[in-house]
Amino acid sequence: MDLIRLKNVNKKYKNGVTAIYDLSLSIKKGSFVFVIGGSGSGKSTLIKMLYREEKPTKGQIVVGGVNVAKLRNKKVYKLRRKLGIVFQDYRLLPKLTVFENVAFAMEVIGATKQETRTKTLKAIEIVGLKNKVHNYPDQLSGGEQQRVAIARAIVNNPKLLLCDEPTGNLDPEMSMEIMKVLEDINNKKGTTILMVTHDK
């Protein structure tokens, strides 16, 4: 079954730049898909359209049975609650510990304290940071910070994980660690992963 389906999608910005032209694709549930391309090839635009930060100029985008392109603004938050998003720049809150950064994603959706604690510890364990729960972001390496960002993205058990160049700021060794974490999430949890990158 397709979790993502794009049909004849175009994205042209107001400055006249066409980021995506006539893109059609489908991604099956449980897949791990890479979109590889150079800078300015529309990779990040694709990710942004999937979580509705951007709208297509033309075409249809369906995520989990929802036509994202036609989704009303007030319903976008419901879509995003079903997604996990990992960015290149981690976006951790510097004054919060590893545990608090991951738990924050549960708190904003109104989860109980018990559910928040249980799911947060599980997500931190999955990314291999059980011994760092009380550390702050500035006490972690770049690879560890990205693992915290991944834990935060998966804590609510999303069906789809969108990764926008998650290894872009990391050296090759740390990049391999992050790829291993993502592969484990895909294999063990069955999470569909769409990752955009300029690396082969």
Please give the residue ranges for each predicted region.
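Conserved ABC transporter NBD signature motif
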Residues: G59-N67
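Conserved ABC ATPase signature
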Residues: Y136-L140, E144-Q146
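Helix-to-loop junction immediately C-terminal to a conserved catalytic motif
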Residues: Y51
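Short coil-to-helix segment of the ABC ATPase nucleotide-binding domain corresponding to the Q-loop/switch region
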Residues: L96-F104
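Catalytic Walker B motif of ABC-type/P-loop ATPase nucleotide-binding domains
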Residues: L161-D164
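Conserved ABC ATPase "signature" region
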Residues: V66-N67, A103, E107, Q114-N131
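Conserved signature/switch motifs of ABC ATPase nucleotide-binding domains
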Residues: N135-D138, V155-N156, K189
